[in-house]
């Protein structure tokens, strides 16, 4: 990863010189490229393992419904990159596999999804210290989070197994990341918007 960080640094410096960027703009560009590189690396790991363990379809469906809500609802993050990898493997590879193989009842997941909807209504969007949400976007993000959540639940009512179970699990999982109990104590900005 150090090689990638070095290349990102060099490219950000090149862009700074070429476009006459100030130090803050340089830092924003570098951070954006670092986040992109980290997300690509995490995707390669998760989807690579999903392919190896023949759960690609399960992982993809769960991840898509999770991401559709997360984009607007936000939520807590893992404390480290390693913990993020472990959580991704558990939540997006192992759990979807178990939901299908253990034939978890759809109505159990639907009930959990309805509880998740209440959580989403109460806590979305969930700001963090590292990802504050501008006050002007809060209402829009809340409405979109609730609308998308309801849309995904309705879609689950008209789709067949295993699709309906996996998309419900994705939204349930995202709703849990909104709960204040999962935010670090030092993250005093949870729920506050700037």
UniProtKB/Swiss-Prot annotation:
GO molecular function annotations of the record: peptidase activity
EC class of the enzyme, as a word: hydrolase
Keywords from the named record: Cell membrane, Hydrolase, Membrane, Protease, Quorum sensing, Transmembrane, Transmembrane helix, Virulence
Compartments it resides in: Cell membrane
Disulfide bridge partners, by residue number: none
Function per UniProt: Essential for the production of a quorum sensing system signal molecule, the autoinducing peptide (AIP). This quorum sensing system is responsible for the regulation of the expression of virulence factor genes. Involved in the proteolytic processing of AgrD, the precursor of AIP.
Similarity comment text for this entry: Belongs to the AgrB family.
Any one biological process term the GO annotation gives: proteolysis
Highest taxon, organism lineage: Bacteria
Organism of provenance: Staphylococcus epidermidis (strain ATCC 35984 / DSM 28319 / BCRC 17069 / CCUG 31568 / BM 3577 / RP62A)
Enzyme Commission number(s): 3.4.-.-
Topology in membrane: Multi-pass membrane protein
Protein name: Accessory gene regulator protein B
Parts of the chain that traverse the membrane: 44-64, 80-100, 107-127, 142-162, 163-183
GO cellular component, as recorded: plasma membrane
